[in-house]
């Protein structure tokens, strides 16, 4: 590119982009912060903006983090009756990722999560108990490594509204919980690597 042309072009772009951002912000619908005002219906997980993060205590030295992606699932919203709401989340075990390529491969193998034989980790709610205006305890079952056990996830409503980019109605939640991995037959290196696994699910649901 001709340098004489490049400089004015870049300068114009620098002026134009903030203007576009301001237009998008001005057009953005307000975010709903009251769960009772969220439109009713069934929402599907938007996988590109949903993450499942896990952490364990590693040898007593560090808290080690990893994550799963390509999550799917559904949320049934009943604004005036939160107890009637339900949620399901399915996590592909093979999507596990860590900062170590070797550890990531190990976690998929038979002596850890065994992704070949147990391809999905699935949570299905059985009841929802509100604990505050924007919080609730979601009781359900977790199926992992061929074992199904009860699990309670603590949910926090982040907000809802129309996503300005895809124009879909969107609801955001954060879910947290603790899984004792030995109860699911994944006991390798316990207690050097903690039995308790902390889960954080940051989920976007759309319809």
Segment roles from a protein language model:
Residues 20-207:
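Low-complexity, acidic/polar, glycine-enriched regions of mature
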Residues 1-20:
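Sec-dependent bacterial lipoprotein signal peptides
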């Amino acid at each position: 590119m001709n340098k004489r042309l490049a400089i004015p072009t870049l300068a114009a772009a620098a002026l134009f982009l903030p203007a576009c951002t301001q237009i998008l912000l001005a057009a953005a619908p307000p975010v709903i912060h009251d769960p009772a005002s969220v439109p009713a219906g069934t929402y599907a997980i938007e996988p590109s903006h949903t993450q499942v993060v896990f952490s364990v205590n590693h040898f007593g030295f560090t808290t080690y983090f990893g994550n799963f992606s390509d999550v799917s699932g559904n949320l049934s919203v009943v604004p005036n009756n939160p107890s009637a709401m339900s949620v399901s989340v399915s996590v592909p075990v093979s999507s596990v990722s860590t900062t170590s390529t070797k550890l990531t491969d190990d976690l998929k193998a038979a002596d850890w999560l065994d992704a070949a034989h147990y391809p999905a980790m699935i949570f299905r709610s059985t009841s929802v108990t509100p604990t505050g205006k924007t919080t609730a305890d979601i009781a359900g079952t977790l199926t992992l490594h061929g074992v199904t056990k009860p699990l309670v996830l603590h949910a926090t409503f982040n907000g809802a509204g129309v996503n300005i980019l895809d124009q879909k109605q969107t609801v955001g939640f954060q879910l947290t919980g603790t899984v004792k991995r030995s109860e699911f037959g994944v006991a390798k290196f316990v207690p050097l690597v903690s039995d308790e696994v902390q889960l954080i699910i940051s989920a976007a649901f759309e319809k």
